[in-house]
Every structure is written in structure tokens, then in C-alpha cells.
Amino acid sequence: MEEQCMLPYYTAQSSPAMGMFNTSMGKLQRQLYKGEYTIFRYAPMFESDFIQISKRGEVMDVHNRARMVTVGIVRTSPCLTLPDVMLLARPAAVCDNARCGPATQKTDSPPAEILELTRLLPLMFVKITIHNSIKKQLHLKLATGRSFYLQLCPPSDASEDLFVHWENLVYILRPPVEAYSGTKAILAGSTSDSSVFEEVQRSPVGYAMKFCEEKEQFRISRLHMNAEMFGSTYYDYTIEI
């Protein structure tokens, strides 16, 4: 309870995304709050669990188990009125030699689920659409043309329809996407307007975005904030592609 109270609420009162960021804290946000990735520790986040499906809505399974994905939508800077980053995470191995000793492995209590943060996607390079509103399915299309289909898996104790927030997100992110302090959305490979890129690089994901011309997603090795050098809205990224 104390952790949730210490997290900031979404403060951009004029933003249409304010409601979704004032929802309860999810497991990915709780994990990031512990400080592994400093840039995301206090960032407002909206997240949901999904299963990956095919275009026809069939569940894509691995070893007879549904492929679970946690999708987090993040606003990384207070100067932005709209979210700018999508995070993807998956369940990690709960116990291994590096994390758990023999004493831990012998306990009968169920271990807490650990998420592995696997991808950082600037939202200006992701097109999110509703694939099937009745079945609560999303279609994610990356700048390279690669597509993914996801079906919402709301918690059993959910007190509201979480898919409404995703529908709202789709609406507010429709082009032109003004997620970077008034700059317009640009597609990967469109590098003719250097002034636009200069403005975009002022956002926390500016360094990461330069890789989007050739890569549609990033594997995060390490993220840390260098506040003394760049100030409160500039971040130093180390990203493994």
C-alpha cells in the first residue's frame, strides 16, 4: 500500500490519457518501482496482460501453454501530454540457480511471479488498432510492417472494463501522434526533416529511437538516468539490439 501511495499520479490534467494512468498499479509497475530501470521507476504506467493470438483469433501456444505478454504504456517525461513508450514483458523463470537457493526451492508457498522486461517500443513507431472489440483483441503493427495480435486477459477481480482504456488509447494515438511536445509522427526511414529529429531527441526515448530505421524492437540490456548531466527529462540509454 505504501508503494502505491508513493507513485505519482498522471499530472497532465488536459490530457485525454489521464484516466487510464490513474488506474491501480499492476505487477509490471510494481516490479519496475523497485528500481531496476530508473527511468521507469516513477513513470505513470497503464498495463494489462494479454495472450498472443493469430489473425484469425486462435491462441498461439508454446508447449501447450498460451503465450502470455504484459503490455505497459508509459509516459516517461512530465513535459509530454501523451504516452510515448510501450513496454513488453513476459513471465520469467521463477527459480534458477542464480536467484534461488535450495532452501527457497523447498518451500511449499507459491513463488511470486517475476516478469522479464524484453522490449521497449517508441509508440510513434507502433500502430495500435482494435482487431475485435467483442473479443477484446488488439492489432499491433510496427514500422517495419510486422504485426502482432493480442487478446486481453483481465484479472478475475477486475472492477471495470479495462478494454475501454485500450480503445481510448487507440483513439488518442491515431495519426498525427503528437506525443513529443507537439512534434508530428514520422515513419521509420523518413530522415529528411532533421529539425523534427532534434525535437524528438529531447524526449527520454530520443536515443533509442534512432535504431528504429532498421530495427522494429529493442532488447533492453540496461537503462539508467544521468540526471546531473542531462537534467530531469534527459536520459542516458545503453540498449542491446
Swiss-Prot record:
GO terms for cellular component: nucleus. Pfam families: GARIL_Rab2_bd. PANTHER family: GOLGI-ASSOCIATED RAB2 INTERACTOR PROTEIN 6, PTHR22574. Belongs to the GARIN family. This is Golgi-associated RAB2 interactor protein 6.
